Amino acid sequence: MKPFLRSQLERYAQRLEELDFLLSREDIMSDMAQYRTISREHAEVTQVAGRYTRYRQREADLAGAREMLDDPDMADMAREEIAAAEAELVQLEDELQRLLLPRDPDEARNAFLEIRAGTGGDESALFAGDLARMYTRYAATAGWKVEILSASDNEIGGYKEVVLRVEGDGVYGALRFESGGHRVQRVPATETQGRIHTSACTVAVMPEPDEQQAITLNPADLRIDTFRASGAGGQHINKTDSAVRVVHLPTGIVAECQDGRSQHSNKAKALQVLQARIQEKERSERAAKEAALRKGLVGSGDRSDRIRTYNFPQGRLTDHRINLTLYKLLAIMEGDLGEVLEALRHAREAELLAELESAA
């Protein structure tokens, strides 16, 4: 284990002793607000300190097993214990590194996933549809729920733009690194000469704000339009102006929803998306300022960043931020996205760990 990590963990162990003492004091116990605050910190510190205690125990076990290697009667058992202890120490160190990393407070939230067709005309819209299906299928394997909030269909299939709401545990934390430019290289169905075309889509992943996070929108700053919904929806569709579009006049940010059966429901969902987009704009501006100070591999999540290429003739997916190349493109497009997301998570954790080390 790196010295700076051990030093941080020793501080956690010391802090746990301090918190145990504080929680035993009568003046703390009689002040409920202070008691709750200290109890929350105690729970967080206990998780780290407990794993570190286990790590030190396995280090001691490993040292003891190595001493037994010189005893012929104990050597076989010692080798088994060494293998088991070394494997557990690797796992524990990985867990401890994660526990020490600063957490994004939005990680556990639901997310809005916005996919827009870019350069490439009809082929780009078809690819936007492919991406929407890929994320929907991955969500199903993760046990998440997906609903389409709004969709602008293309004449030959696919989407000019589609907004999905993905609900489940840890959705934003898992999908946040999908924001950016996605490029596809393939022979379009409409191509008669067999030439490979390059098209692009942009993806934006935004955490769904909760009631405490939600910004207050001044009604005077909003323009609300109603229109007839289009797309799937049975006989109800196009008979009433149930779809809602909301424009935030100060920023020009627009959100719409046509999935619900009532104008009231669509307005509520459109306002949720609008709040998320306004907050994402503020977040992107902050990230751009931070990126000017330090450039991370995984990137800022700006939709102008080209993050990934999907090459169908080669069956290849390449994520340019971490130089990851996988030759299992068809499986990935069917929702087998876990390996990509896990690699991005590990890369981001390595960045954060390096920042911790340089600050230590």
Swiss-Prot record:
Gene3D superfamilies: 3.30.160.20, 3.30.70.1660, 6.10.140.1950. SUPFAM superfamilies: Release factor. One of its GO terms (molecular function) is translation release factor activity, codon specific. The modification N5-methylglutamine is found at residue 235. Keywords: Cytoplasm, Methylation, Protein biosynthesis. Peptide chain release factor 1 directs the termination of translation in response to the peptide chain termination codons UAG and UAA. This is Peptide chain release factor 1. It comes from Paracidovorax citrulli (strain AAC00-1) (Acidovorax citrulli). The gene is prfA.
